[in-house]
Amino acid sequence: MPKRDDIQTILVIGSGPIIIGQAAEFDYAGTQACLALKEEGYRVILVNSNPATIMTDKEIADKVYIEPLTHDFIARIIRKEQPDALLPTLGGQTGLNMAIQLHDSGVLEANNVKLLGTELKSIQQAEDRELFRSLMNDLNVPVPESDIVNTVEQAFAFKDEVGYPLIVRPAFTMGGTGGGICYNDEELKEVVSNGLHYSPATQCLIEKSIAGYKEIEYEVMRDKNDNAIVVCNMENIDPVGIHTGDSIVVAPSQTLSDVEYQMLRDVSLKVIRALGIEGGCNVQLALDPHSFNYYIIEVNPRVSRSSALASKATGYPIAKLAAKIAVGLTLDEMLNPVTGTSYAAFEPTLDYVISKIPRFPFDKFEKGERELGTQMKATGEVMAIGRTYEESLLKAIRSLEYGVHHLGLPNGESFDLDYIKERISHQDDERLFFIGEAIRRGTTLEEIHNMTQIDYFFLNKFQNIINIEHELKNHPGDLDYLKYAKDYGFSDRVIAHRFGMTESEVYQLRQDNNIKPVYKMVDTCAAEFESTTPYYYGTYETENESIVTDKEKILVLGSGPIRIGQGVEFDYATVHAVWAIQNAGYEAIIVNNNPETVSTDFSISDKLYFEPLTEEDVMNIINLEQPKGVVVQFGGQTAINLADKLAKHGVKILGTTLENLNRAEDRKEFEALLHTIDVPQPKGKTATSPKEALENAREIGYPVVVRPSYVLGGRAMEIVNSDAELENYMEQAVKASPEHPVLVDRYLTGKEIEVDAISDGETVIIPGIMEHIERAGVHSGDSIAVYPPQTLSQEDIDTLEDYTIKLAKGLNIVGLINIQFVIAHDGVYVLEVNPRASRTVPFLSKITDIQMAQLAMQAIMGTRLKDLGYKQGVQPYSEGVFVKAPVFSFNKLKNVDVTLGPEMKSTGEVMGKDLTLEKALYKGLTGSGVEVKDHGTVLMTVSDKDKDEIVKIAHRLNEVGYKILATQGTAEKLKEDNIPVEVVGKIGGDDDLLTRIQNGEVQIVINTMTKGKEVERDGFQIRRTTVENGVPCLTSLDTANALTNVIESMTFSMRTM
């Protein structure tokens, strides 16, 4: 069938900022879709609020709007651009919900905009729990016993009928937001209240729990001619009860008989046909392990996290083909881009095993509730490919970057068996490693199965891994056992530990005896057809399918799984670096392990190696490919941390030299450099023991900032005010980075400034200076950044320019450098220097039209910036004001304090741009999920040190018509200044302030931290209640001040004559 010719312009809605449940997979999907539509000759308009994406580059669509993803802003774009059609199924749940709102409000009809792909009726049938249940009943497809509720009372009525446990699934949400498993009345009340709050339809499905069933997923495609295929089927190792995004997943399924596989395949195709899906779709099913009974859990009528995984697992580009199906093309007329000869209607076949393991943020949030359920908690994921299940699992484990390298915890021997079993009986992120530990101690597989309901197939595989460990220990240095262990995915590091050797000795033993991996191609067809996909994985077999060319090569290290502190920004930089390498005529090779990203799309680089980012795995590739050099500065701390290890093997690190990378990180060397170039920093010292840290802090004077060196995202960084706090910190921090010392610095309050620069060794260009709204002490990734700076004098800017050039030249930077400064009462100080790409690179690149990562890569390859027409120093400002606002996922993580400080907590970001600061801030705040209202009620409860400052904010909010509530101490201060205020009772009192928040009486909460970070403190409860009820909680008065400016700009002041 020919593609549609009744439409010319298509609007694509992106998924917005990275949050738990909606990560980089939608940048990958959206980028693919936009390029596919342009390929077919359509004009593409893209709207997305996330600047850290490849999708929002000007080259990806004909017009790109970086605006808040709200009904009003998208309606304006529709009225302005007059698109013929809207494609809603590639922007995650956000895009889907937006399309429904635009349809329901009449905007689409009023502007003659058609919906492409799956019809709205079908989307609503899949998303609306009641309609879906009704359709399944018509099809005779079993669904768990359930009820649809709109109130807590209805939920209790259903509970009385069927009893506990119950699963709560809110409608029209993603990542299981607001849902959970309930075992008692208290949990049911809390979860249903939350679920109704987060569901746009105020609707929850409550179903009898089928926890313990196998969870199976089918990723399916269908076109308008009713051609339908299964792209990939996947099995969750964890049974039903844990969100699939938090489950360890294997593809293809390993424990289904052919009868079971075909039965569930038939059901999946029957359901998508009944729904009328056109494009990609994910079907989740539950299968009784002891019979052929099954239930359908849910259907996602859109491209999802699972479809990104299925695309990377098979090589089959789901989002690209879904976009083409949406404009009328059919599966039997589109060629499979992987083979170039077979058609897209052929179902992919796998001759390898895929393992996906989620990456959780609990290294950041040690007090966060680790228990896993139906609400997703992982920030990202890793994928690994192997010829055996054991191989793919062990490769995935060592990709996680938790400091865990194998099926067990580093300190596993120290736990007693009772504790290990206790941990296994709870579903949390470390259960897999405790299972390994239990098997090592002789616990039977039957006992583990009874505790976890994990299939014996997988438990036997874990047992096999432990058996191989024993054999290695019993046969140290034996080449047959070495080769056998490599076949099953063991790393040199683990083998060395069992052999009683060093890792480098095992590496040498392998080299001397030619025990090396070969690289196999991912080709969608198990080598049935000729294929030229440059997409490879390593395994210990005989035939190598990765043909090495004569071309000069540059290898780029990716940034691994998405986590707090290292997000999609680094993937953006990686992709741009690859494009620059290709433009310069080199062969570009990527090594990465994240299935969600654009960089692991095989069409981006000349060769993609989907492998763990470890010394061993990367060196194996380097030994084969012999690149000219390796680029580490675009892959975040993951890649930087490998530089030293690779250099010891004689690998050339391109760009800033290893010596200079280390000078920026080594405290003493960096201080010596600052002294030489005359750039001041806050007084600080290095400590290698708690005793030394205390001596340093007393000498410098409290408050001090303490942090380990060589970390990203402010990991384990804290401001401490006393000996007692410091002693408590040292117990934690030395754990965070044992091989590196702790830095103790004077804490300076003042404006924080961030600068990104590019240097070729001679010329230093500064694309932009960003001013943070929150003063120093809040991590730069959690601050609102403003470009151009709004309150700096020309003298400040000249000083920042001078210091940046001195630092870049002093460190002999070739490529990118990111510097954070503080402007205190007595001048400008340098806080931190990162000799690599930073998370502000995409933001500044979008604003200034300077492709920073590409320019840096050109400098790394020897191009002079002067020859490209750039002059040294700060580049001319772009027109307008641009704001980068952080986005948090606190509503997904229980027991995590929302207070901002030097350790990063945000998962994503949005951009707001306009002609004035207030308008840009309004867009930034709105895009980040803060509903800015011109009237309402604000609750204030601040620490003593902030009481003078809160008076000014309260006065201004009162002037524009806000009602003010405050706790006793804060209220007394406001009353002294004649500000009308209502006193609210303390927690647990008669007029409990938590009740006021829960009842929806409060629109903003301003709460600053009182001493002591313990979960039990009232402040923590206030902040958590605020987040859980979807109310903006501001923990910095600078943010509160900025919000007040925005509210004032929206309203008129009311004063008597």
Curated annotation (Swiss-Prot):
Large subunit of the glutamine-dependent carbamoyl phosphate synthetase (CPSase). CPSase catalyzes the formation of carbamoyl phosphate from the ammonia moiety of glutamine, carbonate, and phosphate donated by ATP, constituting the first step of 2 biosynthetic pathways, one leading to arginine and/or urea and the other to pyrimidine nucleotides. It holds the Pfam family CPSase_L_D3. ATP 1 binds at residues 129, 169, 175-176, 208, 210, 215, 241-243, 284, 298. Residues 547-929 are annotated as: Carbamoyl phosphate synthetic domain. The gene is carB. Its cofactor is Mg(2+); Mn(2+). Mn(2+) 3 binds at residues 820, 832. Mg(2+) 1 binds at residues 284, 298. SUPFAM superfamilies: Carbamoyl phosphate synthetase, large subunit connection domain (SSF48108), Glutathione synthetase ATP-binding domain-like (SSF56059), Methylglyoxal synthase-like (SSF52335), PreATP-grasp domain (SSF52440). The large subunit is composed of 2 ATP-grasp domains that are involved in binding the 2 ATP molecules needed for carbamoyl phosphate synthesis. The N-terminal ATP-grasp domain (referred to as the carboxyphosphate synthetic component) catalyzes the ATP-dependent phosphorylation of hydrogencarbonate to carboxyphosphate and the subsequent nucleophilic attack by ammonia to form a carbamate intermediate. This is Carbamoyl phosphate synthase large chain. It catalyses: hydrogencarbonate + L-glutamine + 2 ATP + H2O = carbamoyl phosphate + L-glutamate + 2 ADP + phosphate + 2 H(+). Gene3D superfamilies: 3.40.50.20, ATP-grasp fold, A domain (3.30.1490.20), ATP-grasp fold, B domain (3.30.470.20), Carbamoyl-phosphate synthetase, large subunit oligomerisation domain (1.10.1030.10), Methylglyoxal synthase-like domain (3.40.50.1380). Binds 4 Mg(2+) or Mn(2+) ions per subunit. Keywords: Amino-acid biosynthesis, Arginine biosynthesis, ATP-binding, Ligase, Magnesium, Manganese, Metal-binding, Nucleotide-binding, Pyrimidine biosynthesis, Repeat. It comes from Staphylococcus haemolyticus (strain JCSC1435). Residues 930-1057 form the MGS-like domain.
